[in-house]
Amino acid sequence: LSFDFSTVSLTPRGTPASADGILENCLSGYLENAFLRVAARESSISQRVGYEYAAFQALGNYVQWPAIQWCTDSYDPRFRSWYVSAASGPKDVVIVLDVSGSMRNAGRMDLAKQAAKKLLDTLTDVDYVGLVQFSSSASTALGATTLLPATGSTVASMKQWVDGLSPTGNTNFVAAFDSAYGLLRDSSDYSTGCSKAILFLSDGIPTSWTTDNRRRVKQQGQALGGNFQLFTYALGSGADTSVLKKISCDNSGALWTVADGGNLADAMADYYTFLAPLQRPCQVRWTYYNDWSSGMPLLAACLATFKKDSPTLPTSCGGGTTGCMPELLGVACMDVSLIVTQVRVCSMGGASQSSSQPSSPSLDRPSLLC
């Protein structure tokens, strides 16, 4: 650990000579110097800032102060709760998993479970979450009839529920969407009031699907208002992309196709990049999270950054773009001294806690700024 230097971790996931690689390397160098300047102004060792760090969206490059030597191949900052919370703001998320008989093939059920658990790890205490499994019929995680706050205990229980899923039966899209929409519709008292999203995964062709079914799904989405989006994920060679594409495009979303054995977890966890442009710009997010290496609880003040002149975001709909939406560039954070009380921090707009950090029963849920 060195307080005289910053660490720049270049990801193995991209090409350094690409346009994204060159941009992220340049910005990493700038932030490396900026972090050192901030640290130099902190005279008190006991009350100085903690870590300063930033990560970039395109490749996942990461820079932090103080410098530390570590192996980062397995660490992707873009799916850490501090990053997603700052990028997307508070959100209501329903994850829908196909557990029909065909999910036994090519290890698809294991991929779906890994993806669902990775999604849960991106949430914080200001988010609300629901889980639906479907085959011939559909049911919700933990028997919930509304969304649940994404606290540490809720997330842990949902992960256990996911681990217990087993594939069997047919592929009933109608039952799945009715359950997912029901969670969102009946959660007026259990909602952030901000972005809403359904993440729908299937590997097969629906047992029955008509024009009326499509109209029903679209109307239920429209009833949720302008902050709702529906994202679909087609897993494997048997997935019906035509139906999933129409469903997502009817609801301001996007379709991802993932081959058998592909990185489904990263594809599904990337949903927040479409929510990011909807949040209030220049809004600092206060987030408790557990340090990746030490497991210690930390408090971070994070700010998402966007490209000023960015191209439109690609989707699978219409002409292939969503329209003029700012592109997420990355997130920069500073850990605040932990002598700051929880009460003081939670009185600030946008405060949140990582799903891995249990919420304090003595504190009210913080006020939210979308």
Residue ranges and their predicted role:
Residues 17, 21-32, 87, 91, ...:
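Soluble non-cytosolic domains of exported or imported proteins
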Residues 34-40, 71, 78-83, 105, ...:
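Eukaryotic intrinsically disordered and solvent-exposed regulatory patches
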Residues 37-59, 87-151, 173-181, 192-202, ...:
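Von Willebrand factor
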Residues 117-125, 163-166, 181-189, 222-223, ...:
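Sec-exported extracytoplasmic/periplasmic mature domains
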Residues 149-153, 164, 189-191, 211, ...:
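Surface-exposed intrinsically disordered loops and tails
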